[in-house]
């Protein structure tokens, strides 16, 4: 299931980026800044889920290089989002409230809740039985909700 999770997260990242740039052509900078920022969520998730060495069969030093590269990409996306937001989005308070109540944000909130439930099964919290399969299934559902969040970005 973890390889499927990684694929869903990478597709969500690509969807966020493609839709963000398509929306820029239509609506300008407000959704471009938002899309660049939220595209980091599934990308970070993919990095978290990917068992680099086991999946790719590479050395620990190469794994470190990939993690550093992924970190640089995240920093670049966040910096670009911040630059676009600070330079081109006005009024900022209105934009922030729009971001917080945007349908994409609502999907992200739901994904976070489902991901939290998966952690309860992983750790056996709240008197829940430990279950790796339920944890993985709930994570896949959460990541699919992130993919849907990218789809509703408009």
Which sequence ranges carry the predicted segments?
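C-terminal halves and exits of single transmembrane alpha-helices
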Residues: 35, 41-59, 74-86
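Cytoplasmic membrane-interface regions of multi-pass membrane proteins
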Residues: 19-26, 85-97
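Membrane-helix boundary/juxtamembrane motif in polytopic membrane proteins
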Residues: 88-112, 134
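Membrane-interfacial loop-to-transmembrane alpha-helix junctions, especially the N-terminal start
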Residues: 27-40, 100-111
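C-terminal transmembrane-bundle signature of multipass membrane proteins
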Residues: 113-125, 131-154
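Hydrophobic cores of alpha-helical transmembrane segments in multi-pass inner/ER membrane proteins
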Residues: 5-18, 71-87, 139-154
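Juxtamembrane "helix-exit" motif on the non-cytosolic side of transmembrane helices
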Residues: 21, 50-59, 88-90, 119-129
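Non-cytosolic membrane-interface motifs at loop->transmembrane helix junctions
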Residues: 1-3, 57-69, 127-138
């Amino acid at each position: 299931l973890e390889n499927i999770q990684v694929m869903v997260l990478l597709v969500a990242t690509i969807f966020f980026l493609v839709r963000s740039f398509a929306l820029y052509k239509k609506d300008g900078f407000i959704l471009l800044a938002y899309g660049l920022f939220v595209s980091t969520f599934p990308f970070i998730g993919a990095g978290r889920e990917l068992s680099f060495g086991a999946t790719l069969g590479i050395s620990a030093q190469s794994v470190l290089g990939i993690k550093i590269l992924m970190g640089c990409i995240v920093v670049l996306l966040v910096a670009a989002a911040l630059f676009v937001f600070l330079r081109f989005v006005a009024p900022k308070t209105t934009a922030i409230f729009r971001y917080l109540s945007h349908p994409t944000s609502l999907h992200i909130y739901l994904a976070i809740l489902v991901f939290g439930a998966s952690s309860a099964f992983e750790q056996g919290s709240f008197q829940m039985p430990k279950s790796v399969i339920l944890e993985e299934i709930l994570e896949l559902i959460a990541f699919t909700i992130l993919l849907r969040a990218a789809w509703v970005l408009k």
